[in-house]
Amino acid sequence: MNKAILITGIAGTGKSAVCDELAKLGHKAFGIEDIDGLFTMVHKKTGKPFKDYDNDNLEKVKQADWVCDKKKLQRLMSKNSNGLVFYNGTAANLDDLLPLFDKIFLLKVSQRVLRERLSTRTSNDFARTAEVQKWVFSRKTQWENHLIKKGAIAIDASRSLNEIASDIIKRSKSSQ
């Protein structure tokens, strides 16, 4: 069984932690946002790399897109096509990337849990400020609903990492 599985979600839902858990369980799992050269922060108006981007500055956050290089992602995927392979991340051009995957899992948590995670996480500085968090929350429901309409399978990410990973593995192996 060869399957490419995407695990995505809004900032703070636990994508990286779930990816790490899947790797601990012996699966191939890639945090694609952490791979050098695969993503670029671009200015929405120019499409060029954003020179002075700042995760804490709401105006700059609103002007930027986090874009994945589809061709580079395809090369990574072609080198890792044996068995069940997990990729985690999100991108402004996610709709363009979705057809590359056999299944898409959307990690979801409540706004309360999300606020707590964003405020206390140390692995990533995106949405640390209350101002940027408010902006993230304003987009959360619409973005999640959009992905579900595109075929993403919603996963309750407020559970333990082991429960989440086990659920994703089980559903990844099923034909539905």
Predicted regions and their residues:
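ATP-binding Walker
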Residues: T13
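Conserved substrate/cofactor phosphate-moiety recognition/catalytic segment
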Residues: D20-K71
